[in-house]
């Protein structure tokens, strides 16, 4: 599942604008398969995912405060979530996870926001999440979720908190 597809299903199941969520989603050129080398199906799948986000009412582009965070979702009752999203690409999953963690840490300013990492619901990605200790997750107020076209679930370590 490509990064833009993970964003689509995460918003669909976890942050639906129809339930009062205000969602900003930043999309870069690589996610749209513009520039670089991509699998033949990526551009079309990305186009479908982006169209779905737009149809749901997601604001495409940087967030006014959090800039190029992948997703910023705000709800009057549920608070504000800053989310970094990874998907399948030519990059090693471990390196993608470290990059996403670093991006989240750079967004942390002591505010009472929630932070989330979202990846495809696949065993290889779940194994990467197991590298993040429960202590670190608690300290960072960070949840790790696995996303598919069928729903969103917390990984084993997050669910045990």
Question: What residues fall within each predicted segment?
Answer:
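Amphipathic coiled-coil/heptad-repeat helices and related helical stalk/stem segments
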Residues: 67, 100, 128-129
């Amino acid at each position: 599942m490509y990064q833009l597809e993970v964003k689509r299903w995460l918003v669909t199941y976890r942050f639906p604008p129809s339930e009062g969520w205000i969602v900003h989603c930043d999309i870069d050129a690589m996610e749209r398969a513009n520039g670089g080398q991509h699998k033949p199906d990526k551009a079309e799948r990305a186009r479908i995912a982006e169209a779905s986000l737009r149809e749901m009412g997601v604001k495409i582009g940087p967030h006014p405060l959090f800039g190029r965070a992948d997703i910023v979702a705000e709800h009057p009752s549920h608070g504000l979530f800053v989310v970094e999203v990874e998907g399948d690409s030519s990059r090693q999953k471990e390196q993608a996870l470290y990059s996403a963690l670093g991006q989240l840490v750079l967004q942390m300013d002591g505010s009472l926001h929630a932070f989330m990492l979202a990846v495809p619901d696949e065993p290889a990605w779940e194994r990467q999440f197991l590298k993040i200790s429960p202590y670190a997750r608690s300290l960072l107020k960070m949840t790790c979720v696995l996303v598919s076209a069928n729903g969103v679930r917390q990984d084993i370590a997050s669910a045990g908190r």
